UniProtKB/Swiss-Prot annotation:
Any Pfam family hit: Arginosuc_synth
Alphabetical UniProt keywords: Amino-acid biosynthesis, Arginine biosynthesis, ATP-binding, Cytoplasm, Ligase, Nucleotide-binding
Protein location: Cytoplasm
NCBIfam families associated with the record: argG, PRK00509.1
Any Gene Ontology biological process: urea cycle
PROSITE patterns referenced in this protein's UniProt entry, alphabetically: ARGININOSUCCIN_SYN_1 (PS00564), ARGININOSUCCIN_SYN_2 (PS00565)
Domain of life: Bacteria
The family this protein is said to belong to: Belongs to the argininosuccinate synthase family. Type 1 subfamily.
Full protein name: Argininosuccinate synthase
Gene3D superfamilies membership: Argininosuccinate synthetase, chain A, domain 2, HUPs, Single helix bin
InterPro entries per record: Arginosuc_syn_C (IPR048268), Arginosuc_syn_N (IPR048267), Arginosuc_synth (IPR001518), Arginosuc_synth_CS (IPR018223), Arginosuc_synth_type_1_subfam (IPR023434), AS_cat/multimer_dom_body (IPR024074), Rossmann-like_a/b/a_fold (IPR014729)
Binding site for ATP: A10, Y11, S12, G13, G14, L15, D16, T17, S18, A37, G120
Organism: Thiobacillus denitrificans (strain ATCC 25259 / T1)
Residues involved in L-citrulline binding: Y90, S95, N126, R130, S182, S191, E267, Y279
Length: 409
């Protein structure tokens, strides 16, 4: 008899997690609490409630939470303050959602007195690591059930057979072979993996993309937008203030319309393998370009360079599941400190897959001094004679080394 009496399941309402729900009831003879997160994935979530009820889950044990604002405000925006990119390209759309889901799972564990959490991540991927590192960081003694590491339902056929034998409804798409891709979506991105994408030499089919038009089919006329920044975060689009999640949703709409944000990537998973995935991150692509633009006039040079030096480590921490680790929190304090004066506006041109910065301004925090930088008469603001001594001092070590090399010959 298991000592696990109550489990909080991260539940989508789809086939896999519905099978997991029934499997938990049968294998552990335990009470199941379901948790479904609305992260802006664009799916109707009420069916998840109805399916949970069909499994005998009590209404008060079904959690369907709208986390869109918290997701963007407390996770996506802090990440973009660092200009975060993993391996030069990936904007971490899946990675950044997992710590919030882990946090909410633990909150529900504490609220319901559950013994364990359960997730549907496979034993091959990064998500199992992200969910579990987050859970252990927030509740060290929590138990974790990962069915894909325990059961023998390791093929689509076995999963379907289990569902059929236990009366779990099977959508027609699953009977016909399922979705052609494994997809994950939230307000920041949508990802595609599996099937023919497992051949890294094969081009993704055009009808795969859901959020963006092909750049070739994007409007022939460019569209200009203005983003307003306060302490490193976008607070308004074209002068209209809006909550964080509405900012990202609007940028997704604008970017998708203009074919912005497509990515085909082979990435290095934390568990050791290489994986090919395709991503659409229209709003995030705009955010990254705009944030670097506003920082270009408001950040000190050495602070900006320090941020760039630290960014790959920060990105790896998020990708690998260490959002709740002390080193990520420490880096966040530094990053947030640098954003105190990142205020102003950025004007962008959106055109056929491109985000083009056409202007940036900060009334009170710009370090750009036109009286010094001008090519015209600066009225003595900058004494060009000073540059000679500056250059000689910086060249000193190289001159000494060159003289030594000459003597060695």
């Amino acid at each position: 008899m298991s000592d696990i009496k109550k489990v909080v399941l991260a539940y989508s309402g789809g086939l896999d997690t519905s099978v997991i729900l029934k499997w938990l009831q049968d294998t552990y003879q335990c009470e199941v609490v379901t948790f479904t997160a609305d992260l802006g994935q664009g799916e109707e979530l009420e069916p998840a409630r109805q399916k949970a009820l069909q499994f005998g889950i009590k209404p008060e044990q079904i959690y369907i939470d709208d986390l869109r604002e918290e997701f963007v405000r407390d996770f996506v925006f802090p990440m973009f303050r660092a200009n975060t990119v993993y391996e030069g390209e990936y904007l971490l759309g899946t990675s950044i959602a997992r710590p919030l889901i882990a946090k909410r799972l633990i909150e529900i564990v504490n609220a319901t007195g559950a013994d364990a959490i359960c997730h549907g991540a496979t034993g091959k991927g990064n998500d199992q690591v992200r969910f579990e590192l987050g859970a252990y960081a927030l509740k060290p003694d929590v138990k974790v059930i990962a069915p894909w590491r325990e059961w023998d339902l390791l093929s689509r056929e076995k999963l379907l057979a289990y569902a059929e034998s236990h009366g779990i409804p099977i959508d027609m798409k699953h009977r016909q072979g399922g979705s052609p891709y494994s997809m994950d979506a939230n307000l920041l991105h949508i990802s595609y993996e599996g099937r023919h994408l497992e051949d890294p030499s094969a081009e993704a089919e055009e009808d795969m993309w859901r959020w963006t038009v092909s750049p070739e089919k994007a409007p022939d006329a460019a569209e200009y937008i203005e983003l307003t920044y306060a302490k490193g975060d976008v607070v308004a689009i074209d002068g209209q203030q809006m909550p964080a999640h509405e900012v990202l949703a609007k940028l997704n709409e604008l970017g998708g319309k203009h074919g912005i944000g497509r990515l085909d990537l082979v990435e290095n998973r934390y568990v050791g393998m290489k994986s090919r995935g395709c991503y659409e991150t229209p709003g995030g692509t705009i955010l990254l370009k705009a944030h670097r633009a506003i920082e270009s006039i408001t950040l000190d040079r050495e602070v900006a360079h320090l941020k760039d030096d630290l960014m790959p480590r920060y990105a790896s921490l998020i990708y690998n599941g260490y959002w709740w680790a002390p080193e990520r929190r420490a880096l966040q304090v530094l990053i947030d400190h640098t954003q105190a004066h990142v205020n102003g506006t950025v004007r962008l041109k959106l055109y056929k897959g491109n985000v083009i910065v056409v202007g940036r301004d900060s009334k009170n925090d710009s370090l750009f001094d036109s009286t010094i930088a001008t090519f015209e008469d600066d009225a003595g603001a900058y004494d060009q004679k000073d540059a000679g001594g500056f250059i000689k001092l910086n060249a000193l070590r190289m001159r000494i080394a060159a003289k030594l090399d000459a003597r060695r010959k």
